[in-house]
Amino acid sequence: RFLLKLYFRLRLFPRSEARFNKAIIYPKPLDRNNLDKVEPSLSSDHSRHYFENFVMENILRDLPISYLEGYKTLLKMQSQFCEAENIFTANAHFASELFKVWSAEQQFKGSNLIISSHGGALYPLYTVFDHQEKIADYRIVWGLEWMRGQTRMPANKLNAKVKSYNSNGDISLIDYDGLKYSYRCATIPMGPLTVEVYNQNKDFINCLSQDVRKKMKVRPFPLGGWETKDRYIDDFGFDIISSQGSLSNTILNSRLVICAYPQTTFSEAMYSGIPTMILFHEEFWEVQPIYNELISLLKEAGIMYTDKILAAQHVESIAGDPMEWWNEPQTILAREKFNELCLTIESNPIDSWVELFRAISAGGSSKR
């Protein structure tokens, strides 16, 4: 809905570009072990660190086909696409090799590359070597900027706001799951660390009294490789799984929301006005230092926990009326600080987005 309104305000006619999803037929890979000619700059150098030499000696063997044998294929395919004045992306620059090559070629010709956060709350300390900031002409973030060249904008996907609080609703645990193998350089739990997250959540539930546990529902993460939904069913029975159809419905029909990770879901829950907590492994989720004061406030207010026993004790103490705790002065102070640092809340956020895109098109908004 937000995107359609944005198209209308900018007088753009939306269309689907299915060719980005077309199957790519790459050539057969070369025998990388028998490459005869290697650029001198890629050869070993005793002045380099051991790891740098390792990379230089192995990079030709490890480069994906798409960027060696198949790069001409991608160049040819993208040359048939339309020209773009501005390119706006939140996900495609990660997942689509064809989009990456097309957008790079367009940027070389003078297009503006605008990369937006597709979510977030407490941004990771490290994520893909700040690659997005390095390649974007405009880098959009939801909350306070922490790097030069970032532009703060209101979130374009926060819209679930409680109208009628259900004091008899569920206590909802919003779960986390990750892929089976590490896939990105970032300070988030990946691979088997996902099981550590699950074990913490399981132990937390086991610390609750039977009366409170009956009110507990889990919303499993929709994607992932560790089958956490099945694990919850095996450990607690099928009844513990939330029957709500969407994340928004889960949040809005809860008396209390407990998030298992400090990213988009945490922002959505905090924004909703429903009493919200977070229980997570702090050592797995290293975040930007701009949040240090906020983290202290969240912990003091009982919103943030890293200890499952203390979190369970807090839930037990507020389960009867979470809204009373949610409206305490100390809790409100922490909530307001979260909104100040992590969200950009405006009464009509689309106005800011329209203004940004018009300024970029007119050349009036300075590039990175």
Segments the model singles out, each with a brief description of its role:
Residues 1-368:
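Catalytic-core helical/loop segments in enzymes performing group transfer/polymerization on anionic/lipid-linked
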